[in-house]
């Protein structure tokens, strides 16, 4: 489909006799920019690639030649790194977890930038609103904390700690073990991905609703009054989405830090 909403592409207005074409799942499907055989390179792929390049380019510019007194990009970069370290990593992992700082910094800024595309003209799509990209992020996190647990605790000890949370009566184990294993191995990554996807998906739908309503209601008659109200709501929702985009990157990275912390050592 076209990147332009149907209501805009069709020139449909409330007094032109056509019904309101509400946003749908079709607004999350994109025609390939180009194809190589059966592989199609789509807009979300491009935005994800650009997000990665932006993160790499920014931190390269900030820290390739660090100065004793930080200025410009280095100053902003240090603020970002310190934010992740002091607000996300240290509260859960302590100083012993500083080795995971590059991973958490990269994860936080990569997700944040992918979310920010929603409010950038022309792009106007949050990449995690396409659930496949949320699952890719979850897969990276899952592989990381499972690997950390196996390496740091040993496979058998790690599995035991996943299945049995501390001291519990023996008679409850047949019920507790499958529930804990499912929760830690399956439910945990599932909820992590769905939370990010659902928030970005819902936010994008809201923006589409008010954006298409603005166009649909626009005319020389009374519809213009309602169109103006809808247009104002586009800016209100955009401001709200800016906060949500940051919070979702923060929550996703914070939960990742807690999972890694749980893999480093058993809970007591």
Where are these regions (language model features)?
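Selective transmembrane helix interface/packing segments
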Residues: 2-268
């Amino acid at each position: 489909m076209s990147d332009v909403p149907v209501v805009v592409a069709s020139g449909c207005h409330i007094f032109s006799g056509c019904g309101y074409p509400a946003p749908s799942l079709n607004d999350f499907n994109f025609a390939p920019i180009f194809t190589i055989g059966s592989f199609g390179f789509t807009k979300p792929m491009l935005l994800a690639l650009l997000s990665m390049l932006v993160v790499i380019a920014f931190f390269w510019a900030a820290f390739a030649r660090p100065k004793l007194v930080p200025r410009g990009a280095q100053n902003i970069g240090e603020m970002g790194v310190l934010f992740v370290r002091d607000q996300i990593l240290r509260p859960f992992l302590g100083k012993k977890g500083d080795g995971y700082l590059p991973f958490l910094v990269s994860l936080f800024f990569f997700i944040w930038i992918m979310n920010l595309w929603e409010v950038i003209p022309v792009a106007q799509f949050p990449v995690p609103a396409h659930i496949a990209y949320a699952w890719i992020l979850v897969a990276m996190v899952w592989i990381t904390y499972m690997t950390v647990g196996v390496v740091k605790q040993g496979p058998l000890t790690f599995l035991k700690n996943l299945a049995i949370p501390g001291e519990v009566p023996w008679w409850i184990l047949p019920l507790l073990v499958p529930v804990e294993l499912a929760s830690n191995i399956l439910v945990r990554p599932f909820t992590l991905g769905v939370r990010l996807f659902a928030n970005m998906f819902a936010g994008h739908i809201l923006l589409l609703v008010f954006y298409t309503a603005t166009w649909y209601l626009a005319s020389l008659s009374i519809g213009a009054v309602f169109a103006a109200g809808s247009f104002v709501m586009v800016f209100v929702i955009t401001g709200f989405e800016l906060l949500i985009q940051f919070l979702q990157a923060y929550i996703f990275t914070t939960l990742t830090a807690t999972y890694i912390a749980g893999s480093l050592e058993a809970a007591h």
